[in-house]
């Protein structure tokens, strides 16, 4: 089964996540098929978290049967809400 999920990177207590397409049998930080975005939760006190998602690729993979994790679903909702406010 193909899933859209997060891969944790970064230093201790300074996480940085890649949003990837991966087979569910692979480990969390293991091999993945495609990188479709990133999420930086801790930039600094003055800056909000940064989210970048390629929505075209997400829709492509969902149409082909990929399943999003709970956290990725929340990030996609936040990303679409931010884009609507900017436009």
Swiss-Prot record:
Q: Which GO terms describe its biological process?
A: translation
GO MF term set: structural constituent of ribosome
User: Which keywords label this protein?
Assistant: Ribonucleoprotein, Ribosomal protein
Coiled coil residues, start to end: none
Q: Does the keyword Ribonucleoprotein apply?
A: yes
A GO CC annotation recorded here is: small ribosomal subunit
For this entry, the protein name equals: Small ribosomal subunit protein bS16
Q: Which organism is this entry from? A: Buchnera aphidicola subsp. Baizongia pistaciae (strain Bp)
